[in-house]
UniProtKB/Swiss-Prot annotation:
Belongs to the YciB family. Disulfide bonds: none annotated. InterPro entries: YciB. Keywords: Cell inner membrane, Cell membrane, Membrane, Transmembrane, Transmembrane helix. It comes from Actinobacillus pleuropneumoniae serotype 5b (strain L20). This is Inner membrane-spanning protein YciB. HAMAP family: YciB. The chain crosses the membrane at residues 19-39, 53-73, 76-96, 121-141, 151-171. Its main location: membrane.
Amino acid sequence: MKQLLEFIPLILFFTVYKLYGVQQAAITLVIATVIQLIVLKVLYKKIEKSQWIMGIFAVFFGILTAYFNDLNFLKWKVTIINGLFAAVLLVSQFVFKKPIIQMLLGKELKLPTNVWNRLNLGWAGFFIICMLLNIVISYYFSDDVWATFKTFGFTGLSLIAAIATGVYLYPHLKNVENTNEQA
């Protein structure tokens, strides 16, 4: 249910954009994002930092988009968010010497350091690719193509990245289970 809630503002934005245009879609995005954050707080008592960041960016850039009737602000948001996530992942690994993914999931998953490092770098690479794809699609394709790719392309890429992560982790999780069973 939580994942579904995260997609509602995006789907509403896309639908309203196709039917009524940029300004109404941006206003819809802002309202839907605020409602989404309230519902997440009420249902789950906690809003993750990444959800706060995404929500604040969506509201801020959504307001700019609606005010100036210019989709470029939301296009910048996607680039900035992906760049920010990639930077956080890389800084955590190379500056602080502990991948943020390990900090977030280390209690649930017991994995060797090299696996955490590869996983962290893989997701950093994913966000860099998404950032670059967004720049290319923003500047070389129509707004309609961008809106469609933003809604369905990035969602599909995220799903592929999540599946690839599961496939990569599976052998390591089996090794961890075998180690636990022998103990």
